[in-house]
Design a protein with these regions (language model features):
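Positively charged, low-complexity intrinsically disordered leader regions
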Residues: 1-60, 64
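A short helix->loop->beta-strand "cap" motif at the edges of active sites that frequently abuts
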Residues: 123, 181-183, 252-258
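Rossmann-like adenosine-cofactor binding region
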Residues: 197-274
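Glycine-rich phosphate/diphosphate-binding loop of Rossmann-like nucleotide-binding domains
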Residues: 52-64, 147-221
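Phosphate/diphosphate ligand-binding glycine-rich loop within oxidoreductases
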Residues: 36-144, 267
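Phosphate-coordination loops involved in phosphoryl transfer and adenosine-cofactor binding
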Residues: 42-47, 154-158, 256
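Adenosine-phosphate binding glycine-rich loop
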Residues: 256-257, 262-309
């Protein structure tokens, strides 16, 4: 059983914890595919979704996951809350805790914000993305999708291409995949590669062709213009021509390879429309995996809370 109150990142998660989450998520996904969307496990619980950044997939996915498990949900947008009046994250957390929330699901532009909140509250805190730091549930849903397709993570060759420097997804994927025994290759323009990423277990490649060759999974990452200054690459068109994944590049991957992207996708930039719409694409399946993974996490964290350990 997972022995933690919160899910803040995969940097400190064990392989055993990740595997337990994926096992539980696989069961949740089977139920969803059967049309079962009402479970009693979190009856009487309340989950507050506290987002300081915009989101469609993650916010909706967490809300559905909580409701499918029987919990009540509250959505708080920072722009329309007391945060807009200057309330600090710590004080917001204390307020939500005083209302006896069971879960606080937070997305924040500052790296480390979920850790600060978790130290303040009794509720379980789930990191839905903190700055350029981590996005653990996205990595878990990525691994859930991979494992469903290949039956394992160990030994898989995963190519990650795109804006690695500004991507919290890339870091969480790297932590999780390497802990479960996958080989991770990365490629991006030099201006979009963070210093030291190779020391975390990634193999940096000199070309997109080198990264994709023989890969079981080809993952594109969104160019995050909102987190960077101009000048990291000449233009989106030139990025697509020299760094994006098209059908010719994809043909270098394993014959059974799948294509993934955390979304939202810039069609024709990170991936061409032909690649996105190819039968190898698992982008829509990732969305369903996201609901299943978040259902699993809420369930497992509540089990630990109930144990009183």
């Amino acid at each position: 059983m997972i022995k933690r109150k919160d899910m803040l990142g995969l940097i400190d998660a064990t392989a055993e914890e990740i595997s337990e989450i994926l096992d539980t998520a696989a069961n949740m996904k089977k139920l969803l595919k059967q049309g079962i969307k009402k479970l009693p496990h979190l009856g009487g619980c309340t989950a507050t979704i506290l987002f300081y950044e915009n989101s469609t997939r993650t916010r909706t996915s967490f809300e559905l996951a909580a409701k499918y498990m029987g919990a009540s949900t509250i959505n708080i947008a920072a722009s329309s809350s007391s945060v807009a009046k200057g309330e600090t994250l710590v004080d917001t957390g204390k307020t939500l805790d005083a209302m006896k929330n069971d879960f606080i699901i937070i997305r924040h532009p500052m790296g480390g914000a979920p850790y600060l909140l978790a130290k303040t509250v009794k509720a379980s805190v789930l990191n839905a993305g903190d700055g350029m730091n981590e996005h653990p549930t996205q990595a878990l849903l990525d691994m859930c999708t991979m494992r469903e397709r290949f039956g394992k993570i160990e030994g898989l060759k995963v190519a990650i291409l795109g804006d690695i420097k500004h991507s919290r997804v890339a870091k969480s994927d790297l932590f999780g995949l390497t802990k479960l025994g996958a080989e991770v290759k990365m490629f991006a323009p030099e201006t979009l590669i963070p210093k030291g990423i190779d020391r975390l277990g990634a193999k940096l490649c000199a070309s997109r062709e080198e990264a994709v060759e023989g890969a079981d999974v080809v993952m594109g990452l969104r160019i995050q213009l909102e987190r960077q200054q101009a000048g990291n690459f000449p233009s989106l068109n030139e990025y697509a021509e020299f760094y994006g994944v098209n059908e010719k590049v994809l043909s270098l991957a394993s014959p059974d390879a799948i294509v993934m992207h955390p979304g939202p996708v810039n069609r024709g930039v990170e991936l061409t429309s032909a690649v996105i719409d190819d039968g190898k694409s698992r982008i829509e399946d990732q969305v369903l995996s996201g609901v299943a993974v978040r259902m699993a996490l809420l369930f497992l964290l509540e089990q630990f809370r109930k144990s009183g350990k």
